[in-house]
UniProtKB/Swiss-Prot annotation:
Keyword Chaperone: no
Name of this protein: Cytosolic calcium-binding protein 3
Function: Binds calcium Ca(2+) and may act as a signal mediator to buffer Ca(2+).
UniProtKB keywords: Abscisic acid signaling pathway, Calcium, Cytoplasm, Repeat
Lineage of origin: Eukaryota, Viridiplantae, Streptophyta, Embryophyta, Tracheophyta
Residue ranges of the region described as Disordered: 54-95
Location in the cell: Cytoplasm, Cytosol
Free-text tissue specificity from the UniProt record: Low levels in roots (e.g. in cambium) and barely expressed in stems, shoots, flowers, siliques and leaves.
């Protein structure tokens, strides 16, 4: 008895879905397309939020860098800036 009722309910549900699809196939297609777009947007969001290998390496370097290394790096940057400024001064003096 219960099996017959379940089969009847299932067949009625299938008929309702088939009727909806047959009456409004464009709506079903649009809903599927919208769902696909949402899925793709979610995947894209996850991809863009994932840190790149380069970013991870930079973070790892920052963590492992000692204060002495930071001072040395800052000194090298300053020396580079001074050298560039000297070159500009020499060029202006030549003119």
């Amino acid at each position: 008895m219960a099996t017959v009722e379940v089969e009847h309910v299932t067949s009625v549900a299938v008929e309702i879905v088939e009727t909806e699809v047959n009456q409004h196939p464009e709506e079903v297609f649009v809903e599927d397309a919208e769902k696909t777009n949402e899925d793709e947007e979610e995947k894209a969001a996850v991809i863009t939020e994932t840190p790149t290998v380069v970013e991870e390496e930079k973070k790892a370097e920052e963590v492992t860098e000692t204060p002495e290394e930071k001072k040395t790096e800052a000194l090298e940057e300053k020396q580079t800036e001074v050298a560039a400024a000297e070159e500009v001064a020499v060029e202006k003096a030549k003119e």
